[in-house]
Amino acid sequence: MTFTGSLDESWFYLVSVAIEARAGPIVPMMLEAIGAARRGDSNKVVECLRHFAERLDELGGLLERMYETCDPHVFYHRIRPYLAGGKNMADAGLPHGVMFDDGTGEQPYVQFSGGSNAQSSIIQFFDIILGVEHRPTGETRSGGSVTEGGSMQTPAHGFIMEMRKYMPGPHRRFLEHVERVANIREYVASRRNNRALVTSYDACLAMLRALRDKHIQIVSRYIIIKSRESRSHSRSLSPKQAASQRLNLANTLQRGNSKKLRGTGGTALIPFLKQARDETGEPAIDAWARRLLNNGPGGIGIADGVATLGKMNEHLTGEVEVVGLAGTWSVDDSEGGVSSFQTCLAQT
């Protein structure tokens, strides 16, 4: 049973479920690694980390299968509106969220995030096991976030923690318990001379970061490009035609200076996903791996006295420029994406 009855929608869900199923065995394996670290069994920890890295690489391959049967046009215009939710959707015509009419006339408006695989416990489990810490979107490593005026502020908590509220209670409590017992990063850091241990740990970070890179590419193809095509089409319509266009709850509405394209989880996901990707490399143990995984956006810079080259076509402002057959377009930091595996990773 799907909203649209389309194979595209079924495939969208199927890929997400396949990732969950393939990732499932990682949980007991890495819990075993935690126990091995407590016993000081480095060989077992290395074995588990190597299998973890290989499985993460497989998950990236599954994620890329989204392209096979889920058409970006169908996803953006037909499927995504049903996943939009009612939180932070004022620009889409839902300033107060949604109201579930029970016939009494007294029901309040409620605001809930749309369906998002950021609500999946498995991706958050990966981060916890590897010691990856995610800050609220826009917050720097020093603990504050930069406002438009350049001042610093400290946000409450991040989107990833918010999504735990949508998890089944046992899943949420399991993650909280794993946070208390996770020891892999500390164990590896205390044995830096064990090259096999350090390399296998850093390889896991690299594979998880690559998975998030692939997700950003999917967001760009399924959301950003389709959003720009939709805007271009809207500008070509006459005022009468434009007024008759059906409102797409998941699309951008141009109201004043507002142009935020929200993800289905209710957040602007491009800055969220970029920051989550960059944070994934921060715990790397080896200095060279850390420089490689934390390579900042755009151009050439200096880190620890070593010249670094930024991510391809990503400027110092964080803006990503893509050059293709249809010309040049850029991913604005204020725009979002899907909040699912063509969405999550995250998240959600």
Each predicted region: which residue ranges?
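Surface-exposed peri-terminal alpha-helical interaction modules
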Residues: 1-348
